[in-house]
Regions:
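Active-site loop/oxyanion-hole signature of alpha/beta-hydrolase fold enzymes
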Residues: 6-9, 14, 55-99, 265
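Flexible "cap/lid" loop of the alpha/beta hydrolase fold
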Residues: 109-113, 121-152
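Short beta-strand/loop motif that positions the catalytic acidic residue
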Residues: 212, 219-221
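Gly/Ala-rich beta-loop-alpha elbow adjacent to hydrolase catalytic centers
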Residues: 100, 104, 108
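Catalytic active-site module of serine/aspartate enzymes centered on a nucleophile-bearing elbow/loop
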Residues: 243-278
Length: 278
């Protein structure tokens, strides 16, 4: 666990494995943090140099007031600046893999369009980027996060997170506690509000899809995702026909939590194809 200064933004990240191995970068979703990936980055570190970062405005990273940070373009710039700061893309021959969940998938795809010579693999997990408007559960999520009464917010967040799972009984109380702990930090609600407004009504442009057609891509989706339903998985199929597609059965919006072993198997198999040292 480390902090690094990314162009003036104090940024938190987890790092595992040997820096000589290929870099695999994990990008979380809206209102989340690097801890959401749990043991997966560590497990992959036997063969990869894995890094899970807290986006600007989220987790333990700094939460600046400037609104430009909280657009897809702003987050993409932040990730590129982060990669440059930690040295992931400094070498001319450097190749990385990007793994993004939900909002993180949208950001990862955007980064891939800008760094297509550097991005070897792209993994989109229950990704946003094709929403025309917020889904009903996304609106509930926003309302819960914006609730100022801590007791009411706890109950609202608990209900929303339960609805994100295929089986609500799998939700650990600590996940609700962690969300409430982070959202109460100075600037966190501001970051959430701006990010929600800037990411749930915009889409990956056609040129963006064209730019990443030849990037090795895996799209993973929870079969019972209520936040970004599986119809968006079908829409990605049309936009990225060369990608590999996998549905995780009996999983909701975060299949890496509900079906960790199966998710890890799919992910590690994909990443292990043509794996090389730096």
């Amino acid at each position: 666990m480390s902090f690094v200064d990314v162009k003036g933004v104090r940024t938190f990240y987890h790092e595992y494995g040997n820096a000589k191995d290929e870099d695999v970068i994990f990008i979380h979703g809206l209102g989340s943090s690097s801890i959401v990936w749990r043991d997966i980055p560590d497990a992959l570190s036997r063969h990869f140099h894995t890094i899970a970062v807290d986006l600007v405005g989220f987790g333990l990273s700094e939460k600046p007031k400037e609104s430009d940070y909280y657009t897809i373009e702003g987050f993409s710039k932040f990730i590129i600046d982060f990669l440059e700061t930690i040295g992931s893309i400094k070498e001319e021959t450097s190749k990385i893999s990007l793994i993004g969940h939900s909002l993180g998938g949208y950001i990862a795809a955007q980064v891939a369009t800008q760094l297509k010579e550097k991005v070897k693999r792209l993994v989109l997990v229950d990704s946003s980027g094709l929403l025309e408007s917020p889904t009903p559960l996304l609106n509930d999520y926003y309302a819960a996060a914006m609730e100022v009464n801590p007791i009411m917010r706890y109950e609202k967040i608990k209900r929303v997170l339960e609805d994100m799972y295929a089986s609500p009984s799998r939700l650990l109380p600590i996940a609700v506690d962690l969300f409430n702990y982070i959202i109460e930090k100075q600037g966190a609600r501001h970051a959430f509000e701006l990010t929600f407004k800037n990411s749930t009504t915009t889409q990956i442009k056609l040129e963006g899809f064209k730019a990443i057609q030849d990037v090795q891509c895996l799209v993973l989706w929870g079969e019972k995702d209520n936040l970004i339903p599986i119809r968006y998985y079908d829409m990605f199929r049309q936009k990225l026909p060369k990608a590999k597609y996998e549905v995780i059965p009996d999983a909701g919006h975060a299949p890496f939590i509900e079906k960790t072993a199966l998710f890890y198997e799919k992910l590690s198999t994909f990443l292990s194809q043509n794996n090389n040292k730096k």
